[in-house]
Amino acid sequence: MPNNYRLAKVSSLLKKEITLILQNDLENDLIRDHFVNISKIDLSGDLQHCKIYITSTAEEKVRKEIVENLNTAKSSIRHSLGKRIEMRRVPEIIFKDDVVLDKGLSVLKLLDELKNKNQNNNVEEKDAKS
């Protein structure tokens, strides 16, 4: 079982190379038209399985379609990856939508709403006291 340093190095290499493949080699207009970024890579300890989390500027419905397209093209992506890096075995890959950004934006929106509501209540209290 590889140590954490090796996992980090291989994950970093995979992220770099897959990003280049998505930008240069993949013939998919949907992916090219939207800014697709790899936010995180989860690599199994035996280096055999890799979950790739992506973010995009597209709305949720389009992001799901992008993930479907990436998972459809994963064999060609994996093949390109095998040509670019030296590994005994290129890991099986699966693409997933990274919803952390959406959740963070939702939390920020809720905080803004609470702040505005609190400010409105303070204004109403001051008007009532006057």
UniProtKB/Swiss-Prot annotation:
<comment type="subunit">
    <text>Monomer. Binds 30S ribosomal subunits, but not 50S ribosomal subunits or 70S ribosomes.</text>
</comment>
<protein>
    <recommendedName>
        <fullName>Ribosome-binding factor A</fullName>
    </recommendedName>
</protein>
<dbReference type="Pfam" id="PF02033">
    <property type="entry name" value="RBFA"/>
</dbReference>
<dbReference type="InterPro" id="IPR015946">
    <property type="entry name" value="KH_dom-like_a/b"/>
</dbReference>
<dbReference type="GO" id="GO:0043024">
    <property type="term" value="F:ribosomal small subunit binding"/>
</dbReference>
<dbReference type="GO" id="GO:0005829">
    <property type="term" value="C:cytosol"/>
</dbReference>
<keyword id="KW-0963">Cytoplasm</keyword>
<comment type="similarity">
    <text>Belongs to the RbfA family.</text>
</comment>
<comment type="function">
    <text>One of several proteins that assist in the late maturation steps of the functional core of the 30S ribosomal subunit. Associates with free 30S ribosomal subunits (but not with 30S subunits that are part of 70S ribosomes or polysomes). Required for efficient processing of 16S rRNA. May interact with the 5'-terminal helix region of 16S rRNA.</text>
</comment>
<dbReference type="InterPro" id="IPR023799">
    <property type="entry name" value="RbfA_dom_sf"/>
</dbReference>
<dbReference type="InterPro" id="IPR020053">
    <property type="entry name" value="Ribosome-bd_factorA_CS"/>
</dbReference>
<dbReference type="InterPro" id="IPR000238">
    <property type="entry name" value="RbfA"/>
</dbReference>
<keyword id="KW-0690">Ribosome biogenesis</keyword>
<dbReference type="GO" id="GO:0030490">
    <property type="term" value="P:maturation of SSU-rRNA"/>
</dbReference>
